[in-house]
Amino acid sequence: MLTSLLLATVLQAEAIGGYTAGCLKNAMALPLEGPGYQVIRTKRLRYYGHPDLIHYLQTLANQTRMAGLPDLYIADLAMAHGGPFTTGHRSHQTGLDADIWFRMANRPISKWEQDAPKEWALIDEPSYKMLPGRFGPQQLTLLRLAASKPEVARIFVNPVIKSAVCQQAGDEPWVAKLRPWVGHFSHFHVRLRCPAGSPDCEQQAPIPPGNGCGAELASWLKDKPQLPKVSSINKMPVLPSRCRN
């Protein structure tokens, strides 16, 4: 933690703008492997983040390791200067978002597997039901550790996964941070709050009161939510002036 804080101070790391229209100043790269985790899809060069995010991920990986879980697979963070991706996510622009797979690593992976890892969906898309044996104690522990940290603003999960958590741990306060969203069949998406020293970072609206296990979740499960059209995902956002200079 001290190293991250010192680097953030010396380099004046900043998250600028909003999660879906912003950039990142003086990012840190997450080492491609470390205690309790491995970075995947490294050819995308999306393993940069604000120092707070790097510290969060390394701390989480240490905690999951101590809890007896296999290594985490960490996927997209942000690009070196943040900003919009050319493909995929609309967010991940300010170095405060990270994708973590529910599938975990029981062994070091090869370079080929690192670049093209096999996805492990928890949900059968046609039926929109949980696949048997895919969401167990390890996945619940991972979500509990990931969501319990105060710097976490919210975690996006598939509504079916949120429902499973509500059934098993609905009375625990961290469950409120799990927000249902489309997709996310094989991973969850952590989003941190705006960090200190980033005056131009735009906070997202607070999550609603309650654990989110009631009528709101039921509305997501009533009809299978549809993914946004590709054209709307890839539309270039209007970036803050500091991101255009």
Regions found by a protein language model. Give the residues of each.
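Catalytic cores and adjacent binding grooves of peptidoglycan-active enzymes
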Residues: 114-245
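Extended, low-complexity, intrinsically disordered C-terminal regulatory tails
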Residues: 56-89, 156-177
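Hydrophobic alpha-helical targeting segments used for export or membrane insertion
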Residues: 3-12
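Acidic/His-rich structured neighborhood in mature extracellular/periplasmic domains
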Residues: 79-132, 190
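A residue-level signal for beta-strand positions that form part of recognition/binding surfaces
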Residues: 4, 71, 97, 154, ...
